[in-house]
Amino acid sequence: QASIRALVDNDFIVICAGGGGIPVTESGQGVEAVIDKDFASEKLAEVLEAEELIILTGVSKIALNYGKDNEQWLDQVNLTELEQYIQEGHFAPGSMLPKVQAAMDFVQVSKNNVAIITSLEDLADFDHETGTRIISD
């Protein structure tokens, strides 16, 4: 934590908390597990008391009805709206759903927190209008 904090405090852009990793348990016995990169990133941002979390994916924004004729890209969405969209099944498990859930967890930490889901390509021209902004209610 101290190393990452030092980089952030010196204006470095820190890219870390990728997937994989080794699961650790208190029992001392091996377990099968996956360290989810989205939730790991959210937890790191929370510990560092960040106000903004950017989660990268393969598309510019999150969408309702993804891949269908009535696909709708979202510029900004709040927590209540996202809960509804999750209940309606708009986000694929193991794909966009964990990204959305991690973003929601981060925004719930503080009403001032903002999460952005976007693509690496769009991040190159990042102007805080890129991607989907997830905000508090």
Map each language-model feature to its residues.
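C-terminal catalytic "cap/lid" subdomain
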Residues: 1-137
